[in-house]
Each structure stands twice: as C-alpha cells, then as structure tokens.
Amino acid sequence: TRVVTCDNGENVQFLICDSGVIFIERALYGRTDGTTCKEGRPANQLTNTQCSQTGTLEVLSHRCNGKQVCEVNTEVFRTSDPCVGIYKYLETTYTCLPATRSITCEGSDAPLECDEGTIQIHSANYGRRDQLVCSFNRPANQLANTNCLSQSITTSKSAERCNRKSQCDVPASNSLYGDPCVGTYKYLDVAYTCG
C-alpha cells in the first residue's frame, strides 16, 4: 500500500491494516518529482526533485511497525530541512504482515506460542505508544508519555529469547529491557508470526 501526505503542518498520515500488522517497506520525506502535492503551490517550491530527509524510514518503522493502526504527523520529520523553500510530502509504502499481536502490561509475562511452526518476532516495543493500553487504575501522569520507545533493543532481546521456539514467555519488565521512560507505566507489544 502506498500513501502520500502533503506537508501543510496539520496533516497526519494514517496507516491501517484490517488484518495483521504494519511493516514499513519504504519511506520518503521530501520531494522526488514535480507533480506530487503541487496543488496551489508556486513553481519555485517544486523545482528540487532530489530532496529527501535522512532517517525517515527509521522514524516511521519505530512508530508504526507491529501496530494495526498508526498515525504520524508530518511535523515529526521537521527536525531539519533537507531542502529549504521546497514544498515536501511524506510518501510511505507499507505492507500488512499476517502476524499475531501480543500486549502485556508491565509486571506480567507475555506467553507467545505457535500451534504449528516456530516463533518469528517481527517487532517488539517495551514502553508506551498509547494512553489507553494498560491504563486501568493508573494515574494520568504514568500514561502521559506516548513516545516511550525501545524498539530495537526490545525486538533483539525478545527475538534472542523466542525465535525458533514453539512457545516462549517474555517478561514485560525493566529487568530485561531497562527502563526507557522512568515514571511511565509501560507495556510490551510484540508482533510475531509462526513459520
């Protein structure tokens, strides 16, 4: 699936999988042609067609991989400007992996299992990307930080523990992953397939 979002400051890119989970294949923030998102723009804002922000794929992958729905404001890519004066857009290509998603609140164990084949972890995050998940009886200040990510270390440690096994328990705890955001109540979000 290919999605293009013009960067006007309030625009949000919305990715969704009806079944399975998001896997970002390609992502570009910038401009590579003179026709995309040109509506109402002067010609001088469309001239640079070799403009791309480095790190776009990594940022989107961190935010969206393993989720069923993902919203990203184009503002997150404005940390630096790859081509000043050029009107940019976010172009994303993603696929939906037929994965099982397991969510476990901090302090519990995530039981991953395959009836057939063995576990292959595609993405895992220990932290918080949402205010509603694992929020029961928790004070608001423990739920406020929704940009608490530790995806690369969580994915590698979970994969180390579970890949190629038919079942595996992973603790949602600081002892395994460290504490990516002190004071925030976290959860472990794992997307895996059986193969």
Curated annotation (Swiss-Prot):
Temperature dependence: Loses half of its hemagglutinating activity after heating at 50 degrees Celsius for 120 minutes. Activity is abolished by heating at 80 degrees Celsius for 60 minutes.
Residue ranges constituting the SUEL-type lectin domain according to the UniProt record: 1-97, 104-195
Top-level taxon of the source organism: Eukaryota
Species assigned in the record: Oncorhynchus keta
Key words of the record: Hemagglutinin, Lectin, Repeat
Record-given protein name: L-rhamnose-binding lectin CSL2
Recorded GO CC terms: cortical granule
Protein task: L-rhamnose binding lectin. Has hemagglutinating activity towards rabbit erythrocytes and human type B erythrocytes. Hemagglutinating activity is inhibited by smooth-type lipopolysaccharide (LPS) from S.flexneri 1A and E.coli K12, but not by rough-type LPS from S.flexneri, E.coli K12 and E.coli EH100. Agglutinates E.coli K12 and B.subtilis.
A GO term, aspect molecular function: melibiose binding
A Pfam family hit: SUEL_Lectin
